[in-house]
Amino acid sequence: QIEYGGNKLLCEDVLAEALDDHGFPSTVVYFSMVYGPRNIIPDREQRMFARLEAGRPVLIPGDGTTVFQVGHVDDQARAMEAISRAPVTVGRRYNITGKHFQSDLGYVATTAAHIGVEPDLRFIPAATMDSLWDGDLEVEAGSTSKANIDIRTSPEARRRQTSVRHRFRFATVMPRLAPNIHRWNRSVVFGIEALKRDTDWEPRHDLASMVAQTHAWHEETGGREYDWAYEDELLEILG
């Protein structure tokens, strides 16, 4: 676990202790990836918009069947409000995400269909992805990307540091939740039934409506410029 995730776990311990000792009301909520306008991580859906609009190749890890989830920011804000109004949620843990899940290929296809382009798919062989994930394949472009990682001096620790940095860098190519924890082809799906049961909350968006609403915002605001050097080097490795 990196420092960011470790600190969240420590915070949970503090809140649980405050509830047990002082009756301090708290609820722990685990988010999957947030999707929507003004996302503070622009390398997810916003980068995919820009990639497809520019006609760039879309790199697909493995066979593209890995499954993940995103949740729209408006749905998740409504969920947080519902939690704050439901006393039964105190002292409990919940997941918040969208009502559906999709494969990497489905994510790209839905986004491309809305934009009105045919994606140029480039598949990265599983063996290449394994080498990238394990830090055995060095990709120079973007290697200065910063991540808050505990660094030791042993060769194994340096290799692990390299692999974790590459994993987070690759998450700008295809969204991955906690790439420091999950393997590149590990499907990650959250259950939201407990939250729905305890709060009567229900997500309103599916992926298609998330794309439509967020891409409209993207067009209205003019998008942003992206550096494609990392992806270009991956494409060069693939030949």
Which residue ranges define each predicted feature?
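A short C-terminal helix-loop "cap" of Rossmann-like NAD(P)-dependent dehydrogenase/epimerase domains
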Residues: 49-61, 114-122
